[in-house]
Amino acid sequence: MAPRGFSCLLLSTSEIDLPVKRLLSSVF
C-alpha cells in the first residue's frame, strides 16, 4: 500500500528498532 520510498525512509528512521525494521522489511 505504501510506496517503496516511504518504506525505505521509515526503515531509515527506525534504524534503532531492529525487530520493527525486520518486520517492516518482511511486510513491504
Swiss-Prot record:
Belongs to the humanin family. Plays a role as a neuroprotective and antiapoptotic factor. It comes from Homo sapiens. This is Humanin-like 2. Highly expressed in testis. Also expressed in kidney, heart, skeletal muscles and brain. The gene is MTRNR2L2. The lineage of its organism: Eukaryota, Metazoa, Chordata, Craniata, Vertebrata. The keyword Cell wall biogenesis/degradation does not apply. GO terms for molecular function: receptor antagonist activity. Induction: Down-regulated 6 hours following staurosporine (STS) treatment and up-regulated 24 hours following STS treatment. Up-regulated 6 hours following beta-carotene treatment, returning to its basal level 24 hours following beta-carotene treatment.
